[in-house]
A protein has these predicted regions:
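Long, basic/Gly/Ser/Thr-rich N-terminal segments
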Residues: 1-138
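Walker A/P-loop phosphate-binding motif and the immediately C-terminal alpha-helix
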Residues: 140-162
């Protein structure tokens, strides 16, 4: 009663010792995934993150988390710098996505033993605040472009004053 959505890691997921009632392969927008599986009953969904179009943009993952039960989704992360960054992992945890791995062998374990918040709390960064600095102009061969820089700064909390 499991489903699989694969792209880059389709070959690795094909060797997985798990029964799938439905398997799709390719790159999909979050809307396409939601439409295809919103009225489809399944136990767990194994989702290759590369199957989500523009997956490095965390808002695409957020769109899935708002419209699907993420406790049923096991996210197979790729080896890119973006998806392995502490900030990206923290945002996954903030969205309620606790079942993610970079290891294909861990998928079977996560199907039988899903993670809770306690299992992934070490990835959650609570004291980081995003600030938006003023746009910075860069000149590239006479073409001007405006780039907004994002800076992470630790938030200071005052507990008490004596």
């Amino acid at each position: 009663m499991n489903v699989k959505i694969a792209n880059k890691y389709a070959l690795l997921l094909a060797n997985l010792d798990v029964d799938f009632i439905k398997s799709v392969e390719g790159e999909f927008t979050p809307e396409e995934i939601i439409m295809q599986f919103s009225n489809f009953f399944f136990n767990k969904m194994v989702l290759d993150i590369t199957a989500i179009k523009d997956y490095q943009d965390i808002t695409k993952i957020q769109e899935l988390s708002v419209n699907m039960d993420m406790s049923k989704v096991i996210l197979l992360l790729d080896d890119s710098e973006v998806t392995n960054s502490p900030r990206y992992l923290s945002q996954l945890v903030s969205m309620g996505i606790y079942n993610f791995t970079r290891n294909v062998d861990a998928i079977k374990f996560l199907i039988d033993n899903p993670n809770s918040y306690k299992d992934v709390a070490q990835y959650h960064q609570l004291n980081t605040v995003m600030t938006y600095d003023a746009p910075v102009e860069h000149n590239n061969n006479g073409n001007e472009s405006v780039v907004t820089e994002y800076i992470e700064r630790p938030q200071v909390r005052v507990i008490g004053v004596k």
